[in-house]
Amino acid sequence: MLIQFTVENHRSIKNSAVISFAASKDKSFDEYLLRPDEKKTLLPVLAIYGANAAGKSNVLHAMMTMKEMVVGNAAKVSKGQKLPWEPFGGTKVPTSFEMVFIFQGVRYTYGFSFDAKKIYKEYLYHWPNGREALIFSRENGVYEFRENVNEQVTLSNRTPDNKLYLVSSNDWNLPQTENAYRWFMEKLTFLMDEEPATSETVAQIVSGDDKKARILKELMLADLGITDVTIKNTSGKIPVITTTHRIINEDGTTEYFQLLMEQESVGTQHFFACIGGWLQALENGALLVVDEIEDSLHPLLTRRLIEMVQDKAVNTKGAQLIFTTHDAMLLDLNFFRRDQIWFAEKNDETCATELYSLASFSPRKGENVRKGYLQGRFGAIPFIGGDA
């Protein structure tokens, strides 16, 4: 489970910005809360609102870049190869990422600073017995270790300046860093691109009857009129996806007809693309990161997807969700807690993205926060009109 994410100097984000799943003292919807241990209570869902170009998607992009550098293509760098550095406004200072998370009952803090050429700083801490303990740290090429020192010194000497030590240690199956690496690999998932998302749904349908049945159940609950889905040419790059629909005639007889997925509505295609990854995240207890959750979906379908994560009867493994949205219908204190709603706003003077929670405004219980948001009380909306 993710506790918090911090990013500094990435795209439109200049200064350190923190988004936190730690629950406040708000007592509303206590049944939503995740409790990984006796002391910690975490939120299952966070929503980020903001005007176009305010930078809310850049928060999620920073999370995705961090994962890419740990377990993705950017982790496979060779010596001298450039890193995916996208600083604010062309500044020359390093970018920093940090994740605080819980994996297998242990809290970890992992972060690093980098530019296009090298890793300047990297560190990993854990709390195995409730106390902070260093696993490794690295700053300007100088490493510090607490266990298996000789082995890790040898490994650090083989780690080029532009490669994360967490990646190198995983390459060499170092047990001290295995769990942190596994969290990025297994528990951090993204629905940022339609094609990979669709691939996940297709993979689940062809993997077995149980997963296909679960997907069909959700498609039917969504009232899309789909009774079956078939996949052909799964060995090729582009599978042929066919949906089956049922018609009940006036005389009571039943007929079936089929459509190619590309003949379905855009909303149906988007829901189909999402649902496989959604169910997989719930099954794995993963964090799901989604940009523009409402894209082409009916508001009730969007709400259904969120409810699946909020409802502990469905979300039995402690999955979490963070998403960006413009859907003001979700701004409802009868649906979300105050600490679940966040805003991204671009500073008028610096053009840098700033993040803050609705909880910082202390709205009253039952207050119409949707109306307050659209009236500009909480910021993070476009300024329309005025002098050109």
Describe the residue ranges of each PLM region:
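Short beta-strand segments that buttress and anchor functional surface loops
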Residues: V7, F97-I102, T243-H245
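Conserved ABC ATPase signature
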Residues: V45-Y49, T234-L279, E283, L287-L300
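Conserved catalytic network of the ASCE P-loop NTPase/AAA+ motor domain
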Residues: T91-K92, F103-G105, L279-L282, D311-K317, ...
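Electropositive, glycine-dotted interaction segments
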Residues: T109-S235
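Conserved P-loop NTP-binding catalytic core
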Residues: P36-A47, A51, L60-I119
